[in-house]
């Protein structure tokens, strides 16, 4: 939406800019939130400060390192993979736009203003999108949503009544994984010990009972 408006401002005359503002107002009147289908919202993501999100370069490196095969696959893997593809393509187009502006816009002040807007405002939105979908693929959507809610509660709680440090996403799935892994060995380990302590005669009686 903002990219559409920005393109019109750069390439068109003043009357078209006014028309683009009308179109932008119409688009803003639509209740479109790209996070809704995943159980989140723009407002929920906005609780996280801008410096929380890694740089786009780091996020892209993470996405390609973990999910490159799925991202490049022609098949549909998951809604999160599809959203990642769209965000990556959108950022590539924004970079092309910034490069074009840097080469063709004569006024240095206007050129710097447009490039700064793309990097700061649109860059933050892309960073939020990339972080959200990479985190959902890495930790699970429910864990990420729980984390966003917990951070929102932590931020809204007065400083005197909250822990000194904000919740950390990486600690949530680790606790869950440890618990899940810890249950199965605990169930299996007592049985061999009991078998060793039992006499051979009792083992045979157990095997007969099992055959029946």
From Swiss-Prot:
Record family assignment: Belongs to the orthohepadnavirus precore antigen family.
Any one GO molecular-function label of the UniProt entry: DNA binding
Keywords assigned by UniProt, alphabetized: Disulfide bond, Host nucleus, Host-virus interaction, Repeat, Secreted, Signal, Viral immunoevasion
Protein name, UniProt field: External core antigen
Subcellular location: Secreted; Host nucleus
Biased composition (Basic residues): 178-205
Subunit description: Homodimerizes.
SUPFAM superfamilies noted in UniProt: Hepatitis B viral capsid (hbcag)
Any one GO cellular component localisation term in the record: T=4 icosahedral viral capsid
InterPro entries according to UniProt: Hepatitis_B_virus_capsid_N (IPR013195), Hepatitis_core (IPR002006), Viral_capsid_core_dom_sf_HBV (IPR036459)
Sequence repeats: 184-189, 191-197, 199-205
Positions of the pro-segment in this chain: 184-212
UniProt site (Cleavage): 183-184
An individual GO BP term: microtubule-dependent intracellular transport of viral material towards nucleus
Annotated spans, HBEAG: 25-27
Region annotation Disordered: where it falls in the sequence: 172-212
Signal peptide: 1-19
Modification after translation, per record: Phosphorylated.
Domain of life assignment: Viruses
Span list, region 3 X 7 AA repeats of S-P-R-R-R-R-S: 184-205
Record function comment: May regulate immune response to the intracellular capsid in acting as a T-cell tolerogen, by having an immunoregulatory effect which prevents destruction of infected cells by cytotoxic T-cells. This immune regulation may predispose to chronicity during perinatal infections and prevent severe liver injury during adult infections.
Major site of localization recorded for this protein: secreted
């Amino acid at each position: 939406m903002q990219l559409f408006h920005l393109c019109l401002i750069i390439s068109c005359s003043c009357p078209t800019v006014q028309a683009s503002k009308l179109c932008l107002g119409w688009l803003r009147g639509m209740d479109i939130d790209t996070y809704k289908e995943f159980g989140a919202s723009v407002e929920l993501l906005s609780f996280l400060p801008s410096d929380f999100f890694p740089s786009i370069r780091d996020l892209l490196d993470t996405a390609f390192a973990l999910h490159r095969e799925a991202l490049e696959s022609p098949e549909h893997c998951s809604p999160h993979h599809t959203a990642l593809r769209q965000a990556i393509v959108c950022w590539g187009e924004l970079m092309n736009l910034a490069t074009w502006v840097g080469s063709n816009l004569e006024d240095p002040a206007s050129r710097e203003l447009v490039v700064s807007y793309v990097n700061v405002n649109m860059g933050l939105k892309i960073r939020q999108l990339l972080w959200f979908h990479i985190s959902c693929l890495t930790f699970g959507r429910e864990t990420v949503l729980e984390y966003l809610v917990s951070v929102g509660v932590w931020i809204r709680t007065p400083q005197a009544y909250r822990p000194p440090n904000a919740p950390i996403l990486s600690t949530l799935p680790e606790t869950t994984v440890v618990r899940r892994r810890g249950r199965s060995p605990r169930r299996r380990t007592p049985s061999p010990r009991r078998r060793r302590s039992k006499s051979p005669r009792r083992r045979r009686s157990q095997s007969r009972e099992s055959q029946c």
